[in-house]
């Protein structure tokens, strides 16, 4: 076969493969434009069980509304209104950079404060938690992510495996499974002490966190989270003021779903 014909044949095969497996950007990169609106609702349940103590359980939840103000190839600016029920609501202009890895807020005095986005879930795909996906998504494929920083539902030096459960090119929908493990305290809402009840008496115990394990499904539609659930368990050691200790299992169940705009 002549080189020109061979090149044409290879290009044709590459085009066919690309058509069969569209770019991962279609599924996992948001295609925002100014004027679009989104909302989600969310909750996190936390429970701690230790022998000899009453189980402690608490839950918080709320909703958030997003109005896209501007968008570029690797970032976007949104007005974000959010509320955890029972707490004060927030209303801020937030810029997401680096395809969602970094968020920046305009503080009083006109100064911008930027931080890594380390939430367990959110409006969009976040490569800090999910890793950089392959150029093309195929059902059954997987990749590994090193989550070095502690985040909302995991400790530091974590490792996570992401598996493509299914893709639907007709709706630009991808379902991913994430499963991982880490060590130590989480980045937020993770107190170093806990109060548990024993024989009718409340006792304050020091928390020494061990290994966490998480697993859950997330559905993305054009890069936006449509539904997300994650179950996290961690083995802790609780130490009393007298120095005695007891093993404990801590569990968190996170749920986030897209909702009709607005919720607030």
Identify the meaning behind each predicted range:
Residues 2-8:
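Sec-dependent signal peptide recognition
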Residues 19-26, 113-133:
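Amphipathic/hydrophobic helical signal segments and adjacent flexible N-terminal regions
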Residues 20-98, 147-264:
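Acidic, serine/threonine-rich low-complexity disordered tracts
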Residues 121-165:
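Extracytoplasmic beta-rich ectodomain segments of secreted or membrane-anchored proteins
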Residues 14-16:
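N-terminal signal peptide c-region/cleavage motif recognized by signal peptidases
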Residues 82-120:
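An acidic-aromatic
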């Amino acid at each position: 076969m002549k080189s020109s014909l061979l090149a044409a044949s290879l290009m044709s095969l590459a085009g066919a493969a690309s058509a069969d497996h569209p770019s991962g950007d279609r599924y996992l990169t948001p295609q925002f434009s100014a004027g679009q609106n989104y909302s989600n609702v969310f909750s996190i349940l936390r429970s701690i069980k230790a022998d000899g103590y009453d189980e402690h359980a608490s839950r918080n939840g709320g909703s958030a509304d997003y109005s896209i103000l501007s968008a570029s190839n690797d970032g976007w600016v949104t007005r974000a209104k959010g509320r955890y029920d029972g707490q004060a609501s927030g209303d801020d202009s937030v810029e997401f950079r680096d395809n969602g890895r970094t968020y920046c807020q305009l503080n009083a005095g006109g100064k911008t404060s930027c931080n890594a986005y380390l939430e367990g879930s959110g409006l969009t795909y976040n490569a800090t938690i999910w890793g950089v996906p392959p150029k093309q998504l195929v059902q059954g494929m997987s990749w590994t992510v090193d989550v070095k920083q502690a985040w909302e539902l995991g400790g530091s030096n974590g490792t996570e495996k992401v598996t493509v459960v299914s893709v639907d090119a007709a709706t630009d929908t991808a379902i991913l499974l994430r499963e991982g493990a880490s060590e130590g305290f989480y980045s937020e809402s993770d107190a170093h002490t806990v109060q548990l009840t024993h024989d009718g008496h409340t006792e304050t115990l020091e928390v020494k966190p061990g290994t966490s394990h998480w697993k859950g499904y997330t559905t993305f539609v054009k890069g936006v989270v449509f539904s997300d659930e994650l179950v996290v368990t961690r083995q802790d050691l609780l130490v009393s003021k007298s120095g005695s200790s007891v093993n404990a299992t801590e569990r968190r169940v996170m749920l986030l779903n897209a909702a009709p705009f607005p919720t607030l």
